[in-house]
């Protein structure tokens, strides 16, 4: 009887070691996630050797934040979530969070749209200056025939008219010069700066973010690895284990026993993220992540669908099971709902790490 009692105690102990308490998962994972910030802009190197710059491009809206020189372009700022996967400062996230995901086949189409949009802007600018020039010409004609106008006033009016004409003619040259540019021979370059903010720290501006470099990307599976420049994961930060085997398929004896006597380790999944980036994350106590749970509703070879609510900003979040094992990297929500989301299965992150 004593041996039977001890055996039961041993089994219960094994089961208790299987699944992890939700609060413990939340506490541990919160120390390993980071808020990822991406400041980016585009450069179009035209076939004539000149460059134009813009903040972003959308097929429906066209270009926005256009500038003729690099110093005046306003960078677009976006946010996502990342998590530590090594002790040397490596962080996993989505490729679309930290890199340009425009495919080469779309570049020429985008350049053509940029040029068309630029022509419209040049035409608008020309018309604006042409109107000013006509007004200045009228003032010049009056000053030229009015004996009461002093020479100083006349010369100021003339110089103003000439300056307006020079600006107007410059935009005319730009407009007709664009017609000679071949979109197929132009190139889009993506410039960006990636940085992170640690969970549970104070962030008041972009200078409080820590710089990183993008080291690896897998655009086919929307995965990326970034790394702290000093290659040192801070002490006390949880490092997520990226298993060589898939936790959704690999069950230890303890996992099987726990599933029979309690809950399957994959019956519930948890996500730690920064929904809406700093909009929700910034609190009086500093940057705070959100913790949500749900269940897996569908599996494919490369993706999971689960009922975890999320908002933009959660891209790149770690998704773990009830045993605390990393099973997926969150990357997209279904249209018109925040209640069902997709994640990339962890095996593809492992493949990227091993490259």
Q: What do the PLM-derived regions correspond to, one by one?
A:
Residues 36, 82, 89, 93, ...:
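Terminal peptide-recognition signature
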Residues 222-227, 303-309:
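Short, solvent-exposed secondary-structure boundary/capping segments
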Residues 1-4, 82:
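Positively charged n-region of N-terminal signal peptides that target proteins for export
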Residues 20, 99-181, 327-355:
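C-terminal cap/linker of serine protease catalytic domains
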Residues 17-95, 181, 185-199, 206-215, ...:
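N-terminal activation segment of mature serine protease catalytic domains
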Residues 19-22, 45, 77, 203-207, ...:
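Flexible, gly/ser-rich surface segments that form the specificity/activation loops bordering the active-site cleft
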Residues 9-17:
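Hydrophobic h-region of N-terminal signal peptides that target proteins for export
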Residues 19, 89-103, 136, 143, ...:
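Conserved active-site neighborhood of the chymotrypsin/trypsin-like protease fold
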């Amino acid at each position: 009887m004593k041996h039977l009692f001890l055996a039961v105690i041993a089994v219960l102990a094994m089961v208790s070691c299987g699944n992890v308490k939700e609060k413990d998962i939340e506490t541990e994972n919160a120390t390993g996630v980071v808020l990822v910030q991406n400041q980016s802009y585009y450069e179009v190197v035209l076939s004539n050797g000149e460059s134009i710059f813009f903040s972003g491009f959308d097929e429906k809206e066209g270009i926005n934040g256009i500038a003729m020189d690099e110093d005046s372009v306003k960078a677009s700022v976006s946010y996502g979530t990342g998590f530590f996967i090594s002790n040397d400062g490596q962080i996993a996230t989505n490729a679309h969070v930290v890199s340009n995901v425009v495919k080469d086949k779309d570049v020429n189409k985008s350049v053509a749209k940029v040029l068309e949009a630029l022509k419209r802007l040049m035409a608008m600018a020309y018309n604006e200056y042409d109107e000013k020039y006509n007004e200045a010409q009228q003032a010049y004609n009056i000053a030229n025939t009015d004996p009461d106008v002093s020479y100083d006033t006349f010369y100021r009016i003339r110089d103003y008219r000439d300056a307006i004409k020079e600006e107007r003619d410059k935009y005319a040259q730009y407009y007709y010069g664009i017609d000679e540019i071949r979109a197929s021979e132009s190139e889009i370059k993506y410039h960006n700066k990636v940085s992170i903010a640690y969970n549970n720290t104070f962030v008041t501006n972009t200078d409080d973010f820590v710089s990183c470099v993008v080291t690896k990307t897998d655009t086919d599976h929307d995965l990326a690895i970034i790394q702290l420049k000093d290659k040192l994961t801070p002490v006390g930060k949880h490092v997520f284990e990226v298993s060589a085997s898939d936790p959704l398929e690999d069950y230890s004896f303890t996992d099987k026993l726990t599933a029979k006597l309690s809950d399957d380790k994959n019956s519930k999944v948890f996500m730690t993220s920064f929904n809406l980036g700093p909009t929700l994350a910034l609190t009086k106590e500093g940057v705070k992540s959100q913790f949500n749970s749900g269940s897996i509703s569908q599996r494919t070879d490369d993706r999971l669908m689960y009922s975890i609510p999320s908002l933009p900003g959660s891209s790149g979040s770690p998704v773990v099971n009830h045993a605390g094992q990393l099973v997926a990297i969150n990357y997209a929500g279904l249209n018109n709902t925040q209640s069902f989301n997709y994640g990339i299965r962890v095996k593809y992150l492992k493949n990227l790490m091993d490259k």
